C-alpha cells in the first residue's frame, strides 16, 4: 500500500517466523535487501520484525500502521518512523482473524473469524470502544462506503449506517 510518499510492504508468509514489515521509498530498484542487524538503508526507510500477519493486510490510517496477525495480535506502528506504538491481543485473546481491518474517522474495525467486530479508537493506546457479535463465522474484510459499514458473514450481509 502507499501513503505519504512511502510504500508499505509486509512479508508475513508461512514459515517465516520473523514476519517483517517495512516502509520503502518509491523508485527503489535492484537488490534492496537489508544487511543483517540493520533496519534501514538507501531505499528501506524502516523495518519492524514479527508484526506482519499471514492473511490480513495492513492498513495505514491517521498516521499509524495497523497490522493484525491471524492469531489476533495487533501491532500499531507510527507510519513515518516505524516505531511501535503498542502491541496487544485484540479482544484480550481467543480470537482468530482472516479479514483485513478497515478504518474511518477516528475508528478502526477488526472482524474476527467468529463474527465479532472490534471497534478501536485511533489513539496511542488500545481503546476498544465497541464490540459487536454477529453470531456466525466471517472470513471477509468489512467495507466502508460513505456513512455505511458492510459486513458479510457466512449467510448474511449487514449494512450498518448512521
Please place each PLM-identified region on the residue numbering.
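Noncatalytic, solvent-exposed loop/strand surfaces
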Residues: 1-162
Amino acid at each position: 500500500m502507499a501513503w505519504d510518499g512511502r510504500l508499505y510492504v509486509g512479508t508475513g508468509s508461512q514459515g517465516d517466523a520473523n514476519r517483517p514489515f517495512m516502509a520503502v521509498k518509491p523508485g527503489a530498484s535492484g537488490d534492496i535487501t537489508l544487511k543483517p542487524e540493520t533496519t534501514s538503508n538507501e531505499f528501506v526507510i524502516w523495518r519492524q520484525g514479527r508484526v506482519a500477519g499471514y492473511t490480513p493486510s495492513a492498513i495505514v490510517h491517521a498516521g499509524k500502521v495497523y497490522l493484525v496477525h491471524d492469531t489476533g495480535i495487533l501491532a500499531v506502528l507510527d507510519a513515518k518512523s516505524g516505531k511501535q506504538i503498542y502491541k496487544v491481543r485484540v479482544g484480550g485473546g481467543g480470537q482468530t482473524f482472516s479479514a483485513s481491518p478497515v478504518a474511518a474517522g477516528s475508528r478502526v474495525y477488526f472482524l474476527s473469524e467468529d463474527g465479532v467486530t472490534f471497534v478501536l479508537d485511533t489513539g496511542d493506546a488500545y481503546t476498544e470502544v465497541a464490540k459487536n457479535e454477529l453470531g456466525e463465522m466471517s472470513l471477509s474484510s468489512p467495507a466502508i462506503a460513505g456513512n455505511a459499514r458492510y459486513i458479510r458473514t457466512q449467510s448474511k450481509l449487514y449494512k450498518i449506517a448512521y
